[in-house]
Amino acid sequence: MHKILIRNNYKPLVGKIKINGSKNAVLPIMAASLLSSSPVILHNVPDLIDVHLMSKLLESLGAEVNFMHNKNYKANHTLKIDCSNINNHVMPYKTASKLRTSFLILGPMLSRFGKARTAFPGGCNIGKRPVDMHIKALEEMGAKIEIDGYNIIATVKGKLQGKEITFEKISVGATENVIMAATFAEGVTTINNAATEPEVLDLIDFLKKMGADIEIDNTKVVITGVEALNGCVHKIIPDRIEAGTYALAAIITGGKLELEGINLSDIRCITNELETIGAMVELYDGGIVISRKNGSIKSANVATDPYPNFPSDMQPQLMSAMCIADGISVIEENIFENRFTHADELRKLGANISIEKSKATISGIKSLSGANLYATDLRSTAALVLASLVAGGETIINNSHHLWRGYEAMHEKLNSCGADISISS
């Protein structure tokens, strides 16, 4: 069981942090590589547990995957994927069940090979993540989908058929799955109420480089099926959630961090909210410098919603900041039903948090105290790390392996800016 030990040395974090490629962009793009009969090369790939799990899934299907580390520093790695010799359509349960985005392999496998078998997707334990929208849309396109225990078996006779699909609510995963499924479908597929997150747009950009015919107009995506896709070279967009997490580290500790390698337009939905709680954000080409204005952190009322609104993946980290803010803050979680598991652990540090259904009310206090904590998922672990930076004494975070699913070398990056964090197994 991995543990993180954080000692509060009462130092504001000061320095520069390089932002990695986006976890939420690279995983669907890796799945989309199944659509190409020639190699793809991905740059700016983060070295994460989930990336290696997806690599194992692709290899289990017959792909050749080569992860090339950048030896100079922990960022900008390269991934080469060759799916020209796919010889299997069954994903191993042990691997697929650990990874939520394993379900995204269904669309490209159905589209190119007409069959796929996978397990119900795993990942973080943050409530229901229904795959019903994925299944319904694929069935509308002509797929036959059977559920056998924990397994999902999908087949199609001939080609998938282009259809007009309207999602009842915006879903990033369902949008991505249908886009990939539609690339080889017969005719035109139109998705209404599609997700338009930067990560979805990065997937579309990747597919178009390979030869896909995709047009997007606001929340409407139109895909005209093609006969084949070719490999390409693509650079993964920066991780806006990683950037937002480190931005909050600067605010919480009263420090000043330069975050290098950011798409400014992508992170605006985060920095706009941070400015309301007292952040000073200086923009430059490809990065930001973030610090806290004079005084305490301000309270806020925040709701998570699909892009371009405040992302659910930043909600736990923001809650950590609200624990030491002036006044009372309210956070409403509108994406996932069980994404307040970190609240119990923050209370162990002394935080004053009450939960009622999808709303958390946080009454800010002057200081937190170290404790023995247990992480439950990726973003909650990041939230506990942030809170522990300013908790008096020492804090131990158990089950910290979740962190490496979405953050490469977080402890090293924070330590380089003045934190005192160590890792043990």
UniProtKB/Swiss-Prot annotation:
It catalyses: phosphoenolpyruvate + UDP-N-acetyl-alpha-D-glucosamine = UDP-N-acetyl-3-O-(1-carboxyvinyl)-alpha-D-glucosamine + phosphate. Gene3D superfamilies: Enolpyruvate transferase domain (3.65.10.10). InterPro entries: Enolpyruvate_Tfrase_dom, Enolpyruvate_Tfrase_sf, MurA_subfamily, RNA3'P_cycl/enolpyr_Trfase_a/b, UDP_GlcNAc_COvinyl_MurA. Pathway: Cell wall biogenesis; peptidoglycan biosynthesis. The keyword Cytoplasm applies. GO terms for biological process: cell division; cell wall organization; peptidoglycan biosynthetic process; regulation of cell shape; UDP-N-acetylgalactosamine biosynthetic process. It is found in: Cytoplasm. The active site is at C124. It is an enzyme of class 2 (transferase). The modification 2-(S-cysteinyl)pyruvic acid O-phosphothioketal is found at C124. One of its GO terms (cellular component) is cytoplasm. Keywords: Cell cycle, Cell division, Cell shape, Cell wall biogenesis/degradation, Cytoplasm, Peptidoglycan synthesis, Pyruvate, Transferase. Cell wall formation. Adds enolpyruvyl to UDP-N-acetylglucosamine. Belongs to the EPSP synthase family. MurA subfamily. HAMAP family: MurA (MF_00111). This is UDP-N-acetylglucosamine 1-carboxyvinyltransferase.
